[in-house]
């Protein structure tokens, strides 16, 4: 398992440098890896209200960007690490409920890192599903041909 925790800014800045070169190098060496994306840790910020948080839109953008890089390189994003809870917390900003910095204090229950709440986690799952459907590398015929 090869997990990348870059942060949105790094992924965008290095989209055409870091990750593609890494993918090409691993492929060239013939090493089999499972590429895993960690969009949480690199996108942790301090909110204007002083809470440690993660902007949901940055998490989503990083996931989409990682999928795009893998698509361009003929590779697969095979795993995703997210911190989430089934509780209705307000620890990460954004999402369908548009949690703002001002909302964070209402249900901020984490003892360590901010987690996606259940709605944000489901929203992310559907967005990932859409990315997989768009990506021809993940089609049944492509997977069958690769095996």
Positions of the model-derived regions?
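Basic/polar N-terminal segments that are highly enriched at the extreme N-terminus
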Residues: 137-147
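Catalytic-face loop-and-helix region of soluble metabolic enzyme cores
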Residues: 10-133
């Amino acid at each position: 398992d090869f997990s990348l925790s870059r942060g949105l800014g790094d992924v965008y800045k290095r989209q055409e440098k870091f990750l593609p070169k890494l993918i090409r190098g691993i492929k060239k060496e013939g090493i089999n890896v499972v590429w895993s994306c960690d969009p949480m840790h690199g996108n942790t910020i301090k909110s204007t209200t002083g809470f440690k948080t993660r902007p949901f839109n940055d998490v989503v953008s990083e996931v989409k960007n990682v999928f795009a890089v893998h698509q361009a390189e003929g590779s697969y994003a095979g795993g995703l690490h997210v911190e989430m809870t089934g509780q209705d917390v307000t620890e990460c900003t954004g999402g369908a409920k548009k949690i703002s910095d001002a909302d964070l204090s209402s249900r901020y229950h984490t003892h360590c890192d901010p987690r996606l709440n259940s709605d944000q986690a489901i929203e992310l799952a559907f967005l990932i599903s859409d990315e997989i459907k768009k990506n021809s590398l993940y089609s049944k015929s492509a997977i069958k041909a690769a095996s």
